[in-house]
Amino acid sequence: MNPNQKIITIGSVSLTIATICFLMQIAILVTTVTLHFKQYECDSPANNQVMPCEPIIIERNITEIVYLTNTTIEKEICPKLVEYRNWSKPQCKITGFAPFSKDNSIRLSAGGDIWVTREPYVSCDPGRCYQFALGQGTTLDNKHSNDTIHDRTPHRTLLMNELGVPFHLGTRQVCIAWSSSSCHDGKAWLHVCVTGYDKNATASFIYDGRLVDSIGSWSKNILRTQESECVCINGTCTVVMTDGSASERADTKVLFIEEGKIVHISPLSGSAQHVEECSCYPRYPGVRCVCRDNWKGSNRPVVDINVKDYSIASSYVCSGLVGDTPRKNDRYSSSYCRNPNNEKGNHGVKGWAFDDGNDVWMGRTISDESRSGYETFKVIGGWSTPNSKLQINRQVIVDSDNRSGYSGIFSVEGKSCINRCFYVELIRGREQETRVWWTSNSIVVFCGTSGTYGTGSWPDGADINLMPI
């Protein structure tokens, strides 16, 4: 082979090898692109809302004859569908309640800028829980806190923080309100915010941070709502609202709301005589509320809401150990499921109860005359048997020497069941504690447990003598 032939042969072999290497690199590139765009793709309906993807870095070391290729690609997790909550899981079986959260707002107010509040409550989105309260437009160590015992002023706003975070100066003011309710439908928050003159108030419906609808007072006598969470099932949220006398017959309606828009209004029906400040919970496929009768009964009204056909039924908790304050001594109190018991019915306090088969779990003040102490227990047959009084699993939440206040329920969806939780408002200041001029609160929160538990007392704990006047 002459020199020219050798050169041509070597050149041909080199060109062939180079071509093979080039084709291999193209194959590697095609494989990488295919993995990125096809291996991890997810099909989802076009009309479903999706959550932002979280990036994950995957490294692949591919060794070939000629090159070592270190390829880094960024992969998107398949989009997580955001769906309406349907609350179809069963209720958790519990033995009692365990401590969950306490915000210590009053104690912290002795040395920090903490809002003056009342009417607190708790509600959760699918990921975490939040505490709400109606602020008085002032911090505690501020002369504007004088005379904040009054319920309805134009300065009151709905405050919202992550559960356990006191209402500090950086707290978000969600809306203007002296009465409110909030709930999350699985996609966004709904806030119902009532404000204005007593004789012509307005309820604003704020969904996903935007005002969507409103309704004016229909009886011109302090339009008001739950002061605890509303409930949304398959995109329809229900809220109970009352307008009218606090000590005689009033006009109660249930509003059905979809993404902030009122789609239906149903009047109260059934045997309940007076309904205010309902504590509501999902009872699939409907919503159940236990409320306050401020006119005739110290037994609590029950309102059952059918989300599908907008029908309403009402009655009273059957337990003869009644839940309102003031009330008769347990030896003399009564309830027969259908009607108010006409026992110290005038006045009352927001509270809660929930059914557990034929039984009922409930919370109430320990004192039968004042908002002092707090206890929970289960009444066997208390949901279905008239005047049932067999009490078990009693727990003291706040001892009888300390003040309590409003209380209410909220629900938390777990992997296999829906847990019931409650909060207790711990009121401090006026009227009882006249050394100071303000009225405010902290909260303590418990949740249902299937485990064992101990004993204790969880009062507000602030020394009034150390507090700003």
Curated annotation (Swiss-Prot):
Q: Where does substrate bind?
A: 118, 152, 276-277, 292, 371
Q: Give compartment(s).
A: Virion membrane; Host apical cell membrane
PTM note: N-glycosylated.
Q: Which GO terms describe its molecular function?
A: exo-alpha-sialidase activity; metal ion binding
GO-annotated cellular components = host cell plasma membrane; membrane; virion membrane
Give any extra note attached to this record: The influenza A genome consist of 8 RNA segments. Genetic variation of hemagglutinin and/or neuraminidase genes results in the emergence of new influenza strains. The mechanism of variation can be the result of point mutations or the result of genetic reassortment between segments of two different strains.
So which cofactors does this thing need? Ca(2+)
Q: Name the glycosylated positions.
A: 61, 70, 86, 146, 200, 234, 402
Report the catalytic activity: Hydrolysis of alpha-(2->3)-, alpha-(2->6)-, alpha-(2->8)- glycosidic linkages of terminal sialic acid residues in oligosaccharides, glycoproteins, glycolipids, colominic acid and synthetic substrates
What gene is this protein a product of? NA
User: Which residue stretches belong to region Involved in apical transport and lipid raft association?
Assistant: 11-33
Q: What is this protein called?
A: Neuraminidase
Topological domains on the Intravirion side lie at 1-9
